[in-house]
Each structure stands twice: as C-alpha cells, then as structure tokens.
Amino acid sequence: MTRKVALMGAGGKMGCRITDNLRKHPDRYDVAYVEVSEQGIANLAARGITPTPQSEAMAAADAVILALPDRLIGRITHDIVPQLKPGAMVVGLDPAAAYAGVMPMRADLTYFVTHPCHPPLFNEETSPEARADWFGGVAARHHIVSALHQGPEEDWDKGDMLARDIYAPVMNNYRVTVEQMAILEPALVETFAATCI
C-alpha cells in the first residue's frame, strides 16, 4: 500500500533532493509536491512536476515532510497542522522547531524528526559521484539520526523507512531524542569536526 506524502518546499534545496529520492519509490509513496516560490516551481518543472495546492495536499496526507527554512516552520505549521487528518505524521528535518516548541502539537498526530549526519570525511567511496557528494542524499552513503517525538511506537517503523528513503543511501539510522539531536546538531557535531580538521 502506498502512503500519501505531502512534501512542503518540494522545489527548494533540500526539497529537490527529497523529490529525487522519493521518485525512486513510486510503489511506496504517492507524493504531492507543494511549492510556492518561483524558483522552486521552476526546479519542479525541470523535473516534469506540477506543484499540488497546499490545501489539497494536506487533506490527503498520511505524512507531511517539512523541507522548509527553519525560520518559516512555525508560521507554516500553524497553518497546515489543523488541516491534517488524525493519525498523520509530521516529519521535521531539523530538531530546532520541535525542541523549541514552535510547531503546534496535536495529540492525534505523530511527530517524527530526522536529520542527516552527512557522509564521513574519511570514507570508502570509490565512484566520483559519491566522492563529490559532500552533503549526502545523492550518492554517498551516510548515517542519519531520528526521533519519534510524539506518537505510537509502531509509527517508528513508518518514520524510519521514510527517513531512509529521503536521505538515501543510508548506512544506519540511529534513534535519539529530539533533545539529544538538538545538542548534537549543530553545536557538538560542527564544533568537534572543525576542531579535528
């Protein structure tokens, strides 16, 4: 059975990476690509995709991925969360909004937060494409971290599969809390990595 996924910010930097990865799994996902910016719409058009109106996408969504700039998440989620059907999953790509409490929380929704760890600086990638993929999500294998912030335990598996697909290729998905993720990214990860380099 395919899951109906609404991808908010589908034509942006992160949105395009997710768009490209979700299109590899038409058997798993029926994706509504939501985009309002002129450049984002052009990026989707280059992929042969026409954006879906936000209200239409929200009404049908089993999961909503927030591929949005952090500064917009609070405002946009206050608009879309009331439109979601009970049992839907809100997927954040960064812990900041969930940890700071800027997203409205509904008891009947699942909130899943996931973040890439990015490819290791020292790795075993051999293809030129993978070696040039410093961010991950295109060709280089990397780890991710995820948290089931709110929702039934059985939703972990749904979130895990979605996270692995949007960030593919993934080596491991390490389960953490939103608080742990907020501490690790960016403070610990970037400070530690910069010191080592």
Regions found by a protein language model. Give the residues of each.
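NAD(P)-binding Rossmann-fold cofactor-contacting core
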Residues: 25-47
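Rossmann-fold dinucleotide-binding core
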Residues: 94-184
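A short helix->loop->beta-strand "cap" motif at the edges of active sites that frequently abuts
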Residues: 28, 84-88, 107-109
